[in-house]
């Protein structure tokens, strides 16, 4: 977890430098003659340079999207209709599952359509909507992962006070604050990005309207965007990760103090799925944005294609793994899934 914390701090620094460098390049271009006709739509480049890969990519992403819908949908239904799951942990898990469905549905369907129809243009308003939902879901997920870590900390380190600290009012409020904060953050970032003038180049070198890719096309000062994104990263990436880090430090200390091997194993099993999701989530973000800049000079086109495939892992594979990890590592979830599928009582 210490490595994850350091990685995220590095991500912040590199992310800010990356956007600032892009702005410097745009500022230099503005000194020349640029077509000042404001763009009314954007063109999503995707993997247009690799037509053979696109076919494989379409089939792969379609299968994964169906798994996301089914897997997370089953977890949501189980958390609602099974009384065994009316607890803070499964309430947060249900929220995370719903978030994963919303997050992927904001970009995957349009990506699939563009791959099969070769229609890659997206309207200005459509890009804004896609950017808003993508950023909102990402921000909310960071907060939810932090809330889930705090839930595990209270359950393991303060079990007697767990019903009091994590009362129904408390955990519903925690989830609501996560959603509201993520939405407000995304609205601010989206409005600041889409208020910028976009002239000349309208090609987004990405599968979706990712905010950093869009900012590169702006032909105006983006200093305010940089400042707000740094603040946003601190609030929605670093702070939740610090909560996760310290929660697991206390959890680890408590587990090591247990005399029973069975108790230690049971305590760790309740955290392993969440910890795995956190490592994948933050690890992928770090790998996407904190790679050494020197690598961009060698095989830039291939590296850009690799970055897009990594973004697939971040945007599709992680939401797909969430229900799988929680189902495989949790007997209650597996029993509930069997109950929903077979409609037989759970013993």
Curated annotation (Swiss-Prot):
GO terms for molecular function: G protein-coupled receptor activity; olfactory receptor activity. The chain crosses the membrane at residues 56-76, 85-105, 130-150, 170-190, 228-247, 268-288, 308-328. GO terms for cellular component: plasma membrane. The keyword Membrane applies. Residues 77-84, 151-169, 248-267, 329-347 are cytoplasmic. It is a multi-pass membrane protein. Glycans are attached at residue 35. Residues 1-55, 106-129, 191-227, 289-307 are extracellular. Its main location: membrane. InterPro entries: GPCR_Rhodpsn (IPR000276), GPCR_Rhodpsn_7TM (IPR017452), Olfact_rcpt (IPR000725). Disulfide bonds join 127-219. One of its GO terms (biological process) is detection of chemical stimulus involved in sensory perception of smell. It is found in: Cell membrane. Pfam families: 7tm_4. PROSITE patterns: G_PROTEIN_RECEP_F1_1, G_PROTEIN_RECEP_F1_2. Keywords: Cell membrane, Disulfide bond, G-protein coupled receptor, Glycoprotein, Membrane, Olfaction, Receptor, Sensory transduction, Transducer, Transmembrane, Transmembrane helix. Odorant receptor. Belongs to the G-protein coupled receptor 1 family. This is Olfactory receptor 13C3. The gene is OR13C3.
């Amino acid at each position: 977890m210490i490595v994850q914390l350091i990685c995220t701090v590095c991500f912040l620094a590199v992310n800010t430098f990356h956007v600032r460098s892009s702005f410097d390049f745009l500022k230099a271009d503005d000194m020349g003659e640029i077509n000042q006709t404001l763009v009314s739509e954007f063109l999503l480049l995707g993997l247009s340079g690799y037509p053979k890969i696109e076919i494989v990519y379409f089939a792969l992403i379609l299968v994964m999207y169906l798994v996301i819908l089914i897997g997370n949908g089953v977890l949501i239904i189980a958390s609602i209709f099974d009384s065994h799951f009316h607890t803070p942990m499964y309430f947060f898990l249900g929220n995370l599952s719903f978030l994963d469905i919303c997050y992927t549905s904001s970009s995957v369907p349009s990506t699939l359509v563009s791959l099969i129809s070769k229609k890659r243009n997206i309207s200005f308003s459509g890009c804004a909507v896609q950017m808003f939902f993508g950023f909102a879901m990402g921000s909310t997920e960071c907060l939810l992962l932090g809330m889930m870590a705090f839930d595990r900390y209270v359950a393991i380190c303060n079990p007697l006070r767990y019903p009091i600290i994590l009362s129904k009012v408390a955990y519903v409020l925690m989830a609501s604050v996560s959603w509201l904060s993520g939405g407000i953050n995304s609205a601010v970032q989206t409005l600041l990005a889409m208020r910028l003038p976009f002239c000349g180049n309208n090609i987004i070198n990405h599968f979706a309207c990712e905010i950093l890719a869009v900012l590169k096309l702006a032909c105006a000062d983006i200093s305010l965007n940089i400042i707000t994104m740094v603040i946003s990263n601190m609030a929605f990436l670093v702070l939740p990760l610090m909560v996760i880090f310290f929660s697991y430090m206390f959890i680890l200390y408590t587990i090591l103090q247990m005399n029973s091997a069975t108790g230690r194993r049971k305590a760790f099993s309740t955290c392993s799925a969440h910890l795995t999701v956190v490592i994948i989530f933050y690890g992928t973000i770090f790998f996407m944005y904190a790679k050494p800049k020197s690598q961009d000079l060698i095989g830039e086109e291939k590296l850009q294609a690799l970055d897009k495939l990594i973004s697939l892992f971040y945007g599709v594979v992680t939401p797909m793994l969430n229900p799988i990890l929680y189902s495989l590592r949790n007997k209650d979830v597996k029993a509930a899934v069997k109950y929903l599928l077979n409609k037989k009582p759970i013993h």
